[in-house]
Every structure is written in C-alpha cells, then in structure tokens.
Amino acid sequence: MRVRWLAAALCALGALTLAGCDSKIGTAAVVNGSKISESDVSRYLDPSADDASGARSTALQYQIEQKVLTTALRGKNALPSDEDLAKGHDQALSNLFNGQLSGDAANQALAKVLGQNGLKASFGEVLIRTVELENAYSEAINASQAQDAVAELAKQHIPVSVNPRYGSWNAQSFTFTGLGSKQLPSVVTLGTTLPGDVKSSNSQ
C-alpha cells in the first residue's frame, strides 16, 4: 500500500535540527553537511514571473526534502539507484494528481501549474523525484501509515539549516510558512496534499 507521508512526516518532532543557515554567500540551505546553493534554487525560477519569492521557497523546500530522504535511505542501506527510482517515474507523476491524470496529460498539466506559480517546467522532475524517494522510504521501513514513517525518520536526527532570506521556516511542518495549496492550486485541487498543507489536513 502506497503511503503519501511526506506532507506530515518531515515535521518529525526532533528529527531535524533547524537553525540559521551558514551565512556564506550563495548558500540557500545545508542538509547533513550537503550544501544547496542559491544557484541550485534559481535555476528553476521563471525569470518572467512577477513575484519570485514564493517560487524560490518552493524550489528550495523540495530540494531540502530530497536530500533528507536520500540521507535517510542511505542510513538504512536502502537508497535505490537512479535507474531504479526512475522506474517509478510515471506512477509518481500520476500520484501528484491523485491518479486522475497520467502520461502526457499529467506532464502538460504539471508544467502549466508550475508556470502559473513562477517555476520552470523542469522543476516538475524535482517534484517527481521527491515522490519516488517518499515511496522508497516508506517501502524500506514497511510503513503502512504516515506516522510510522515520521517516527522512523525522527530517529535519524538529520540536521538541516536554512538561509532565512528564503522565508519563515516552520520547524513543525518542515516547510516554509504559507507554502502548499497557495503555490500549486491545481495540483491540490486534484487531490495532492502538499507539505505546506499539513496542519489544515490534520485538523479536519
């Protein structure tokens, strides 16, 4: 059974050490000693967008999540190869739309949503890889529920630090405050719960 747990998992209550990011110029975030540069973030931003602030934080958020998941999987000697992860590409893409779209239709819809929110279509591959890693981690620990994955991830104490210029970092949901359905409304409408929506989804 597939578990879409990342929306809730990365709050982890102690799994992450959050602090002001290294002040070195060009650093957006550091995950377990691995740097995410500002150029890693800006490469996914649409230069024609009116307001890049939300897109910038979204681009960084998912790159952080990828590194956390990669570190967690490696710690369990369960990190799949890029080739093995890619085998789940089409299913991960469809899962972004809760199974309601797939193939070219899903690719086109995702590119449109990203463009409407200041992100290049190439950022879609970041989202898809994040879902692939979510699936791999859930399978690695045989998680049947989101809270099982949260508890297991918390045991690894993966350190994360973030440059505050990217927004207000929420240590409870492991997201930038305000991200979620506001950034990718069409995807959420189709059924996906994004990380920024964790509190509202849990309170219902």
Q: What is the predicted function of each stretch?
A:
Residues 1-55, 155-204:
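Short, low-structural-confidence N-terminal segments
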Residues 6, 12-14, 110, 115, ...:
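Terminal low-complexity, poorly structured segments
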Residues 22-120:
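N-terminal targeting/tethering segments
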Residues 37, 106, 133, 145-146:
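Alpha-helical structural motif
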Residues 70, 133-139:
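Short, hydrophobic/amphipathic alpha-helical patches that form generic packing surfaces
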Residues 83-86, 94, 98-112, 116-130, ...:
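Cell-envelope/extracellular anchoring and linker segments
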Residues 138-165:
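Acidic/polar surface patches and capping/hinge elements
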